[in-house]
Amino acid sequence: MTDHYAVIGRPINHTKSPLIHGLFAATSGQDLEYGAIEGSLEDFAGDVARFRAQGGRGMNVTAPFKLQAFQLATEPSERARLAKAANALKFEGERVLAENFDGIGLLRDIEVNLGQPLAGKRVLLLGAGGAVRGALLPFLAVGPAALVMVNRDRQKAAGLAQEIGHPLLSVSSYEALQGERFDLVINATSASLVGELPPVPADVFAQAALAYELAYGKGLTPFLRLAKEQGVAQLADGVGMLVEQAAEAFAWWRGVRPETRPVIDRLTLPLT
């Protein structure tokens, strides 16, 4: 009997998840179907309940429903509780298990696919939204020299740092970054989605080995263009993170971790 999974979000027409999970299933010999659901802003819980009633085994969750997915869970993981967001659900009888694989997907892409271990490195995170919340624990676990978070709303970043309470995690401002040096700079703001550049001083890239843009499929965004102009050798967008977090969810559901490299290669667009 074929198992059913789906991604839910709004809008959902842009999603790559059915393609990704279809490739995972084909290469790992798993019998499943994976669809896409345009969620209702007024009745997310009803959408999930209907999918479960039809025999659904699990769901990926994307914007704007990650908080609601977390709230719906009967058993959220530690990562989901910290992020106050879930990007994957698993249904086992009456139990609704929730996970957040965004951070571990980002970490795997940076360390495994891009060959940039974070241990002992100075890392700058631009933004303090859900993706950053999900990344903090996995990043801190590998022992960076420093993890610095900057957000337009400094109070939001400060509250998150206080919540984590880790000595390697600190909060700065865009103005205070002048003259600071980092090994890795990650843009997790929404600026690139609208073709804008976060107000980051150009010299933060002076010693950076990697500039990483969480948005994907946007080509050379203003953030990546600035990094390139400043001589950063390695540029990446978020397609690898997308595939790696999908692989984590697939393994959680199926007990088999699929190969990700062929899928990343298929989806990667030139950064030009």
Language-model features, listed with the residues they occupy:
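NAD(P)-binding Rossmann-fold cofactor-contacting core
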Residues: V142-I164
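Helix N-cap at the beta1-alpha1 junction of Rossmann-like dinucleotide-binding domains, i.e.
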Residues: I12-N13, R154-Q155, K218
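Phosphate/diphosphate ligand-binding glycine-rich loop within oxidoreductases
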Residues: T2-L114
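Phosphate-coordination loops involved in phosphoryl transfer and adenosine-cofactor binding
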Residues: T2, A119-R122, Q207-A208
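Adenosine-phosphate binding glycine-rich loop
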Residues: G120, L214-T272
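Rossmann-like adenosine-cofactor binding region
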Residues: H166-L235
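Short glycine-rich anion-binding loops that position phosphate/pyrophosphate groups of nucleotides
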Residues: T62-K66, F70, G129-A131, S190-L193, ...
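Glycine-rich adenosine-cofactor-binding loop
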Residues: G9, N100-G103, I110, L114, ...
